[in-house]
């Protein structure tokens, strides 16, 4: 029954994605004067060159980190949306470490990423403590802290790291010793991709092969039952958000060291935390599916960007796809009747099998 339920949930997700894509394609056909060009760029543009495919992989890296971070917190039934702020603050603090603390080339990025991760853990840990100590909603407090993080980060960059010779509010150049190397020729795909995949494997192991993972999932499923079972749910709630924050903060540090010459996110929050929510929902909070969901979302965005350059359709079409997907996946009534029929059919079959076994024993 459990396997069938998982299969049904996967079917719901696939159908939601398919329906949203169909709606987007129909919209393109209706609004574009050159629908053939638009559709070709959208669907196949990311595959027409190594550079474009590399763009997909580049965008996939931060989405994996924020998707993992959000997924771990969601599994504990904690709707902490602080991954955005943790990602941003991880990058801000990493800028200080990279620029102000000279180190050997191999050690420099490792230390910088670890400190960025710890920064993210502290950031997401604050709403967790507020939730446990005073019952404050982690959803509301984490949303507010994202904006606090943005303006506090801008203050730090502006007053301590701003390059006066640059034409905008950006930091000094990051030293070469702190940068992550590129791993695919003719692209900007960096070593962060390998780190991201290792993080996925680690979180899958911890989530499904350790006692902590069992406690985390049980607390998310039913916190009262978890307490009756002897689990300290307060500790689980805090630890899930600390780990999620660490992953998001490390992701911000890796994104900075892999793709940027200096810290330059001064116009607005980078948005990867919000995208991580979409990735986590698509992956059903399962770490094993996070890379696939991140790749799918990155592919859509690069395809839409190429479409906007080569045709008369703007890349905001991705917002339509994302919105429809989230609504259908989150809607409890989507395919509800089909699920009831499946449960009823399986229950009837189980009862019939049980009755046959009883008759055989009595006979």
Predicted segments with their positions:
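Cytosolic-side transmembrane-helix boundaries in multi-pass membrane proteins
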Residues: 1-19, 29, 201, 221, ...
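Interfacial/capping segments of alpha-helical transmembrane domains
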Residues: 25-46, 160-172
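Single transmembrane alpha-helix segments in multi-pass membrane proteins
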Residues: 27-31, 37, 44-101, 113, ...
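Short loop segments and helix-boundary regions at transmembrane helix junctions
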Residues: 2-11, 74-82, 104-106, 110-168, ...
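Transmembrane alpha-helical segments in multi-pass inner-membrane proteins
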Residues: 242-248, 252-254, 258-323
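Helix-loop-helix "hairpin" substructures at the membrane interface of multi-pass membrane proteins
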Residues: 185-262, 287-288, 292
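Transmembrane helix-bundle core of multi-pass membrane transporters
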Residues: 138, 142-209, 262, 317, ...
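Hydrophobic core segments of alpha-helical transmembrane domains in multi-pass membrane transport
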Residues: 13-29, 63-70, 91-97, 117-122, ...
